[in-house]
């Protein structure tokens, strides 16, 4: 229903925009007007395509997203997707804090047996898996239940490496809903059995929503082109849940 309403609203806005701009260019030559109208239609079609991809992804993975921990099926492992601990302004990142709280709750509620912390590790000063590991230890999660993937540079890397490198064949992704949806798209495209437990998130700013639309477009192109993680290598299987 929400998907249909979004498309109808976009079409109404598009028609109004085209009518308004067409009125503005009537003073120009017919040749210029035709060129402008063609360009306008192309831009409008591109916007509609982006919205279709964005809403289509949300609809496609809707059955694999869980917000209630009581309804979440058990999986041996949770893949916790990394993000920066602090914002650009130096304030605590609520997305980061919420993901750690969600990961901790999965351990406490015995919805998973261990955590795979995956994130960026490009420099000595910026290390998402290390930060998550340290903070989860402070939150009381035993270090024996946590493993780190230092090559989770992108969502695509984190999801595929969990399967190919760490040999985790079924797992729960932990992140905010908009991020979960993109991660699940990647997982399903690679025949990876994954579900998602949604971490709490603040109200999304418009800029965040726009960035996510473009991130989803890029994810679709990556899947079409068969883009692989930056780093693969020898498998490093995580212990079976029965050994923990």
From Swiss-Prot:
InterPro entries named among the record's database cross-references: Cell_Envelope_Assoc, DUF218
Q: Which residues lie on this side of the membrane: Periplasmic?
A: 53-244
The answer to whether UniProt assigns keyword DNA damage to this entry is no
Record localization:
Cell inner membrane
Domain of life the protein comes from: Bacteria
Ranges that cross the membrane:
32-52
One Pfam family, short name: DUF218
The record describes its membrane topology as: Single-pass membrane protein
Q: Single GO cellular component annotation?
A: plasma membrane
Sequence ranges on the Cytoplasmic membrane side: 1-31
Keywords attached to this entry: Cell inner membrane, Cell membrane, Membrane, Transmembrane, Transmembrane helix
**What's its job?**
Participates in the barrier function of the cell envelope.
Write down what this protein is called.
Protein SanA homolog
Record the organism.
Answer: Haemophilus influenzae (strain ATCC 51907 / DSM 11121 / KW20 / Rd)
What is the name of the gene encoding this protein? sanA
């Amino acid at each position: 229903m929400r998907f249909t309403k979004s498309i109808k609203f976009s079409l109404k806005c598009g028609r109004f925009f085209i009518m308004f701009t067409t009125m503005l260019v009537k003073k120009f030559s017919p040749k210029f007007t035709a060129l402008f109208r063609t360009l306008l239609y192309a831009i409008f079609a591109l916007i509609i395509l982006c919205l279709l991809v964005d809403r289509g992804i949300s609809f496609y993975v809707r059955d694999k997203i869980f917000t209630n921990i009581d309804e979440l099926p058990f999986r041996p492992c949770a893949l916790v997707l990394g993000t920066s601990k602090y914002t650009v302004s130096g304030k605590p990142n609520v997305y980061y804090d919420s993901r750690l709280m969600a990961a901790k709750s999965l351990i406490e509620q015995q919805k998973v047996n261990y955590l795979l912390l995956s994130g960026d590790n490009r420099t000595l000063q910026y290390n998402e898996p290390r930060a998550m590991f340290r903070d989860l230890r402070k939150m009381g999660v035993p270090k024996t239940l946590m493993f780190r993937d230092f090559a989770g540079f992108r969502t695509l890397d984190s999801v595929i490496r969990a399967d190919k490198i760490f040999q985790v064949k079924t797992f729960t992704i932990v992140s905010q809903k908009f991020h979960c949806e993109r991660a699940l798209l990647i997982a399903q495209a690679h025949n990876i059995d994954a579900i998602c437990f949604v971490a709490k998130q603040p109200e999304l700013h418009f800029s965040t929503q726009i960035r996510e639309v473009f991130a989803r477009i890029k994810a679709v192109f990556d899947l079409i082109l068969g883009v692989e993680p930056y780093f693969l290598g020898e498998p490093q299987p995580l212990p079976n849940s029965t050994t923990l």
